[in-house]
Each structure stands twice: as C-alpha cells, then as structure tokens.
C-alpha cells in the first residue's frame, strides 16, 4: 500500500550524505505515530528540517496556506489567456481552459494526499517526493531541474516582467510619455525591492507578503475585466471579430501552451503544506485541502471573467502569439484613463514583487540544504541573507542577459509542465500502489501519459514556431 518506513529514512540519509547528525533515529518496522501533541504538530520531523526555511516553522493554518496558494496561483500568465482564446476561439478556448483547471485541481489533490502517505512521515518538498517515488537517481533527474527552473526561472521572468511594468508605469505617469529610467535600471529597482522582501526567515513568515500579493492579484484581474465591460456596455460588436484565421498545428498548440502555463505551481504545494501542523486527529491534508479549494475558487473567479470579458471586448485585436505580458497590459489599458492604467500597473507590480519570495523559497531551501550538509550546522542569519542575495543577483543577471525569455515561455515551460500534469499521477501509483488495472490505476496512467504527450507536443510546436518566426535574441540589451 505505501512506501516502507525504512526506505524513507534511508532517503533522508542519502540526501544528507549519511551523516548521523541529519538522520532520524533508527526506524522500526512498525508505523510510527505522529507526535503532534508533544512537539506542536511537527510529527515525523527530522533534525535537518528544523534548520531549513520551508519547514523551519510549522505553525501555519488554513488562512496562511490559502494566501500562499493564491499569491503563487494568480500568476502573471493569466494576462495571456485572452491571447490563447484569440487563437482557439470561444468553444475550444473554454473547453481547454476548464479541462486544464480540473486537471490541475486533481493533481494537486494527489500531492496533498501524498504529503503524509505514511503515518508519521511528512514529505515537504517536491524533489523529495520524486526521489521517494522513482528512486534516488531517477527522482533527482526528473525532479531537480524542473523544480529549480520553476523556482529560479519564475523569479527571472518576474524580474523581466516587473521591471518592464515599472518602465511602462513611469511612461504613463510622465507628461511626454517617456520613462526616466532605462530597462536595466528598472530591472535593478525591481530586483532590489524583491531581494529585501526575500529576507524573511522561512516560508511561514511570508504570510503578510502573500496576503498583499493575493489582494493585488485579485485587484488587477478584477479591474482589467470590469473596465471593458463597463465602457463597452453600450457599444456594438461590429468592429470586433472572433474568427480564428490561423488553424495550423503550431498556432493552436502555442495557444494551448499559453493556457498550460497558467496552471504551473504544483512545485509549491508540498512546501506550503509543510508549513502546517499535523497530528493524528487533524492531519495536515485536511487543512491543506480546504486551503486548496478556497484558493482555487478565488483563482477561478479572477481567471475566467478576465479571459471572457477581455476576449469579448477585443476579439481579434489581441495578438495571439504570446510574448511579454507588458505588451498585453498596454493593450488592455490604452483605451482607459491614466488613473486606471496606473492602478492596473501598480497592483500588477506589487503582485509580482510579492510572488518573488515565495517562488524563490524552494531554491533557497535547496541551497541551504547543500550548506547544512557540508557544514553540519544551521545557516546563520548572515549566511542565509548572503545566499538569498546571491540567488537574487543570479536572477537579475539572467534577466538582463536574456530579456527575450518571455518569448521562449512555452518552449521551456513545456518541460516543467510535467511537474503539474504528469509526475503526480505516477507518484500516486508508485507510493499508493493501487491494484494493477483497477480504475484508479488506469485513470492515473491515462492522465499521466496525456500530460507527457502534451509536453512533447508543446515542445515540438514551440520549436517549429521558433524555426518559422525566428527569435530576436537581444542578449544584454533589454
């Protein structure tokens, strides 16, 4: 039915280099009770977890988990959803958007249940679950790159998008429509603020940041769809067409890729659940699932109206190619007042800033794990601060050196798509071991294979699109 306890303890030993300092007491063959009543709900905790930022504090609750999920779930990619509809049309756009939402919700449920697949043992990191499911070598191969890409890559995209949005905001506020700062300077301003916000000691302490980020995300999504509905209520739709002109394989799958990118974020589910207390009477999966349902309901309330209203208002005027989010923000605000445009850009920038520390946390946790393994002691405040400054500088340098990364979002994101749509299904089969050819086994195999096939098709379509359209690779010239 589940992983043997001894295997999980062996996993911890292998991850920490086998040092006794980082190993739990010798495991027995019987399941260990969750000792939440004795240690504040931190049952199954190994010593090294007390030193790492993701599991340093387990005093979270349904509210902290909800806002963490909201802040990381309302991503900047939601702005691109109307572009996907411009390529797919009303019917197929709605079907794919809905199927993707349900698919993401299902795989999230799988991860929530796998967090404590064995009583007394908590797996609070996606990479660790991959290793527990597929073995050390294969688990690291399949898990580390996508998770590190989703962490560092998301922060890099946030620097590019947030920096460009700052520049656009300054242009809107200026009288002559010029920005007083260059793109690099705007990237630097964004990175410095984000770097400061990343100095919170652990994931649970980021609750205030997530709260602000969630409200900012809800605010800009709501205003973006309300403005065209309010201003176009008396307007006829003669000038707007909803016909899809290009029905090629490349065009269609690029649009599907834009929708798929919205549903990233499963790399943070286990980490957020790791901040919750757990005991035999109230396991963390119950609290986490309530948070997942609330956050996904709010994300749907933001995402679906924005997509439908903006596509209804602009139709074929929306570029269906994707690319920088700032171009779409400019399109959505150009027909409205300066105050409205400033509000949308400002809330969007704050949302990006608040998302940055949460997305950076898995990378910080992995780097600190390496440090702790070598030094056999927890990272000091200075060391932790310098590690986060270093990671932020890396993201800033990549953003300045490769400012065209938003044009490659579907190509690179197709690899990380497996984290959301594929791996959880096979993890469930590996750990829970349902009876072969049972409905649950067949369903997870089918869903997992569909996710892998989708990833391959998106990779092929993105590569073909690059071959056809080319890429303006403006290295170090943002």
From Swiss-Prot:
Pfam families: Aa_trans (PF01490). The chain crosses the membrane at residues 64-86, 90-112, 141-161, 178-198, 206-226, 242-262, 292-312, 341-361, 380-402, 407-429, 440-460. It is found in: Cell membrane. Residues 87-89, 162-177, 227-241, 313-340, 403-406, 461-478 are extracellular. Residues 1-63, 113-140, 199-205, 263-291, 362-379, 430-439 are cytoplasmic. It comes from the Eukaryota. Keywords: Amino-acid transport, Cell membrane, Membrane, Transmembrane, Transmembrane helix, Transport. Residues 15-45 are annotated as: Disordered. GO terms for cellular component: plasma membrane. Amino acid transporter. Belongs to the amino acid/polyamine transporter 2 family. Amino acid/auxin permease (AAAP) (TC 2.A.18.2) subfamily. This is Lysine histidine transporter-like 7. It comes from Arabidopsis thaliana.
């Amino acid at each position: 039915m589940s992983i043997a306890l001894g295997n999980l303890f062996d996993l911890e030993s292998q991850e920490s280099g086998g040092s006794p300092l980082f190993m739990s007491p010798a495991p027995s063959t019987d399941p260990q009770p969750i000792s939440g009543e004795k240690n504040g709900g931190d049952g199954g905790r190994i010593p090294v977890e007390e030193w790492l930022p993701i599991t340093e504090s387990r005093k979270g609750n349904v509210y902290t988990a909800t806002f963490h999920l909201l802040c990381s779930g309302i991503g900047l990619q939601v702005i691109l959803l109307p572009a996907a509809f411009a390529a797919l049309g009303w019917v197929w756009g709605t079907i794919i958007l809905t199927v993707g939402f349900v698919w993401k919700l299902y795989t999230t449920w799988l991860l929530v249940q796998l967090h404590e697949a064995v009583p007394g043992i908590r797996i609070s990191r996606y990479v660790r679950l991959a290793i527990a499911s597929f073995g050390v070598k294969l688990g690291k191969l399949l898990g580390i790159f996508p998770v590190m890409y989703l962490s560092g890559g998301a922060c890099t995209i946030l620097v590019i998008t947030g920096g460009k949005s700052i520049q656009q905001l300054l242009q809107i506020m200026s009288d002559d429509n010029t920005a007083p700062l260059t793109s690099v300077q705007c990237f630097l301003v964004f990175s410095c603020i984000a770097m400061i916000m990343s100095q919170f000691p652990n994931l649970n302490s980021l609750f205030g940041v997530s709260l602000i980020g969630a409200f900012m995300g809800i605010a800009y999504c709501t205003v973006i769809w309300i403005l065209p509905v309010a201003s176009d209520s008396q307007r006829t739709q003669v000038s707007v067409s909803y016909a899809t002109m290009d029905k090629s394989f490349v065009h269609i799958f690029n649009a599907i890729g834009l929708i798929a990118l919205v549903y990233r974020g499963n790399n943070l589910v286990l980490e957020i659940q790791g901040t919750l207390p757990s005991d035999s009477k109230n396991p963390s999966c119950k609290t986490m699932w309530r948070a997942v349902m609330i956050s996904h309901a709010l994300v749907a309330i933001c995402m679906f109206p924005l997509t439908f209203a903006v596509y209804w208002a602009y139709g074929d005027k929306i570029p269906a190619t994707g690319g920088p989010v700032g171009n779409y923000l400019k399109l959505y605000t150009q027909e409205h007042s300066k105050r409205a445009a400033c509000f949308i850009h400002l809330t969007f920038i704050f949302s990006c800033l608040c998302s940055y520390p949460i997305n950076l946390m898995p990378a910080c946790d992995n780097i600190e794990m390496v440090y702790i393994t070598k030094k056999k002691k927890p990272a000091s405040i200075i060391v932790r601060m310098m590690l986060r400054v270093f990671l932020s500088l890396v993201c800033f340098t990549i953003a300045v050196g490769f400012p065209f990364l938003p044009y490659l979002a579907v190509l690179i994101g197709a690899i990380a798509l497996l984290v959301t749509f594929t791996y959880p299904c096979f993890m469930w089969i590996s750990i829970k071991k349902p009876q072969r050819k049972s409905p649950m086994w067949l369903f997870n195999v089918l869903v997992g294979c569909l996710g892998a096939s989708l990833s391959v098709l998106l990779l092929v379509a993105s590569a073909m699109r690059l071959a056809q359209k080319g890429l303006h690779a403006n290295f170090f010239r943002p």
